[in-house]
A protein has these predicted regions:
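Histidine-/acidic-rich catalytic cores in large beta-rich domains
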Residues: 1-179
């Protein structure tokens, strides 16, 4: 006789919030990037509270007053790696109230030239050094400088005969100019 597989295999795969105990949680909201949708703000029950469509945060960050720091797209992957087109602060209704895209003017083959932030992975607005909620450390929403982690291409024959992708930290004034 053949021995059958005696291991149990699940037939139900829970999704969403499976256990929520408000007394044991730091209650709040979660913001995440849904590919091809936008920034989704969810409550502790896993319900969608707000969607900012057409943004591509890398990452998205919520600021006081319902503002969102995000990007509105990425550079074509054939020519850059994780280069944000811009870094923007938008209001609850999706209106741009601050923008930075003047890191580098990019002319990729077959694509109209444009200024890009080339931002990726991190940025901090004056007032908060953490980038997430911390009591007494709220980022400014109508002024202040912003630190932006960005890319620049470099050549250094002591390292490689190939073009290098380098990281830079830019400090950007509220008016969008680099310090």
């Amino acid at each position: 006789a053949m021995q059958e597989d005696m291991m149990g295999h699940p037939t139900i795969y829970p999704t969403g919030v499976t256990v929520y105990n408000p007394e044991k949680c730091w209650n709040g909201f979660t913001i995440f990037q849904a590919l091809e949708v936008g920034a989704v703000l969810m409550n502790m029950n896993g319900r969608e509270n707000k969607v900012w469509k057409g943004v591509h945060g890398f990452p998205n960050k919520i600021f006081p007053g319902g503002y969102l720091m995000t990007s509105r797209g990425s550079r074509d992957g054939r020519y850059g790696v994780q280069d944000g087109l811009d870094l923007v602060q938008i209001d609850w209704d999706g209106n741009v109230v601050w923008k930075f895209d003047r890191n580098e003017y990019i002319e990729d083959p077959g694509i109209p030239g444009r200024w890009m932030a080339r931002s990726h992975h991190d940025y901090q607005r004056e007032g908060s050094t953490t980038g997430y909620y911390a009591p007494g450390m709220e980022p400014k929403t109508d002024s202040g400088n912003t630190l932006v982690l960005a890319h620049r291409n470099a050549r250094n024959p002591k390292i490689s005969d190939k073009q290098l992708l380098d990281d830079v930290i830019l400090e950007v004034y509220w008016d969008g100019d680099i310090v």
